[in-house]
Amino acid sequence: MIGRIRGMLIEKSPGQALVECSGLGYEIDIPYTTFFHLPETGQEVTLHTHFAVREDAQSLYGFASRLDRNLFRLLIKVNGVGPKLAVGILSGLDAQQFIRCVEARDANSLVKLPGVGKKTAERLLIEMADRIGQLEGQFVPSQPDVPTGAGAATASQAGPDPREEAEAALIALGYKPQEAAKAISKVAGPDMNSETLIRLALKNMIPAG
């Protein structure tokens, strides 16, 4: 089991990070809430990880905090929730926001997540109600501990148009192209990078609390 990786961040994009550790490059699937906290490429990063093995694939999932990683492990035990949907859930809501939804039995916020219908939302509320007790002591109002460099990225780098990149990221998460374009248009401002656009769009689409 690979429980944690610390190394140099070589590449990052919404949904994935490439981390070099001891000469090996690890492709790690990450939720957007973790992507937002990654440092600039070339800096050191620590990710709490979950290694999944299937007949047709081996996947490594990375998270900004132990709480996010441990919640992911509980989510994939819910009937009908696989790793992809669990990552999608943690892309729209961070662990603490999700826990608050469960405690408040807030199905309305959950059904706004792509891939989560009414039945899945109700199943999540029922099955996770008892399981979140396993996270006791981890649910604290603190910042994720992922960056060990100078901090999260704040400026866009040369590359694709930020709006197009942000729309593509929302579509990859499961939103329809029209929904993604509308959400980005609502929050777009001058000199915004794709990370900021995605974060603000998700905040509007999935209000927490």
Swiss-Prot record:
Transmembrane annotation, as ranges: none
Superkingdom as given in the UniProt entry: Bacteria
GO biological process: DNA recombination; DNA repair
Protein keywords: Cytoplasm, DNA damage, DNA recombination, DNA repair, DNA-binding
Any one cellular-component term (Gene Ontology): Holliday junction resolvase complex
Ranges for region Domain III: 158-209
GO molecular function, one term: four-way junction helicase activity
Pfam families: HHH_5, RuvA_C, RuvA_N
Region described as Domain II: 65-143
Main location: cytoplasm
Matches recorded under Gene3D superfamilies: 5' to 3' exonuclease, C-terminal subdomain, DNA helicase RuvA subunit, C-terminal domain, Nucleic acid-binding proteins
Domain I: annotated segments: 1-64
Record SMART domains: HhH1 (SM00278)
Region (Flexible linker): 144-157
Subunit structure: Homotetramer. Forms an RuvA(8)-RuvB(12)-Holliday junction (HJ) complex. HJ DNA is sandwiched between 2 RuvA tetramers; dsDNA enters through RuvA and exits via RuvB. An RuvB hexamer assembles on each DNA strand where it exits the tetramer. Each RuvB hexamer is contacted by two RuvA subunits (via domain III) on 2 adjacent RuvB subunits; this complex drives branch migration. In the full resolvosome a probable DNA-RuvA(4)-RuvB(12)-RuvC(2) complex forms which resolves the HJ.
Family, similarity comment: Belongs to the RuvA family.
Free-text function comment from the UniProt entry: The RuvA-RuvB-RuvC complex processes Holliday junction (HJ) DNA during genetic recombination and DNA repair, while the RuvA-RuvB complex plays an important role in the rescue of blocked DNA replication forks via replication fork reversal (RFR). RuvA specifically binds to HJ cruciform DNA, conferring on it an open structure. The RuvB hexamer acts as an ATP-dependent pump, pulling dsDNA into and through the RuvAB complex. HJ branch migration allows RuvC to scan DNA until it finds its consensus sequence, where it cleaves and resolves the cruciform DNA.
Domain topic, free-text comment: Has three domains with a flexible linker between the domains II and III and assumes an 'L' shape. Domain III is highly mobile and contacts RuvB.
The protein's name: Holliday junction branch migration complex subunit RuvA
Gene name in the database record: ruvA
